[in-house]
Amino acid sequence: MNSFFIKIMLFLVISHVSCSKSETDCCNKTEINTDNNIQQKAKVKIMPLGASRVQGARPNYESYRYELWKLLEESQYPFDFIGTQKDFANYPIADFDKDHEGRGGWTSSQINNNIDTWISQTGVPDIVLFSAPGGNDILTHQPYRQVLENIHSIIDKIQKHNPKVIIVLEKMAPGHSSFNTPNRKALFDVIHSDVEKIAQEQTTETSKVVVVDMANGFEDAFLADVLHYNSIGAKFVAQRYYHILTSFLEKE
């Protein structure tokens, strides 16, 4: 009788230990799964780089940045606009990311002379949206050979900071037809062709330089003045950037 009782007690003790271990393992697995579920993708750092078409000047004319931000947010891409400049204009959505690297009137020489400093201050970008390269140079009659050298140098410096950077290089949208003299149009046609060459020459095994065509399909009705976007133009440009970016971004 005593032997039978002892066996029963041993069975109950072993069963209790086994159940406790199973519950502990189950809890541990739940905690691991919970940790995995809350992990988020790192935000891709995007630098909008250029002059007044990047900067914007609400309410006089628009930048594409707000419309692009909305498209990326709505699609739930993890991203962060970066830059040393802040946009202090009012926008319908208060938490719009206003960081950028656009300075009205700046030439490729000025950007080339400052890009290293900006990156050291704002952090290294994963993607750079290089708006209207050479646009202000043409308008201010800078030597064209120097313009091309500056664009190459800007890209070289960005790639030195991040050998895996993606650079989106614009074929810039034209100015108003009343503003485009035959000479200006010829120069813009040349730089459009050279932008394609620059992208090919600057692409490396790890860093892609891709072209986005803002010129084809762009109309006078998209401009607030002879050079800058109105809201329609900003949406047009943002949509083209968005289409390119979806090839490189992953959703959360």
Predicted regions and their residues:
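Sec-dependent signal peptide recognition
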Residues: N2-L10
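Bacterial Sec-dependent N-terminal signal peptides
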Residues: H16-K43, K251-E252
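Loop/turn elements at helix/coil->beta-strand transitions in domains of secreted/extracellular proteins
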Residues: A42-K45, S75-D80, G123-L129, H161-V168, ...
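Histidine-centered active-site loop/cap adjacent to the catalytic His
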Residues: I46-L49, I111, D225-E252
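Active-site-proximal beta-strand/loop segments in catalytic clefts of secreted hydrolases
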Residues: L49-R53, I82-D87, F130-G135, E170-G175, ...
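Conserved SGNH/GDSL esterase-like catalytic core that processes O-acyl groups on lipids
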Residues: R53-E149, D189
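Active-site segments of SGNH/GDSL-like serine hydrolases
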Residues: S131-N136, I155-V190, D213-A215
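Substrate-gating cap/lid alpha-helix
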Residues: P174-D213, S231-K235
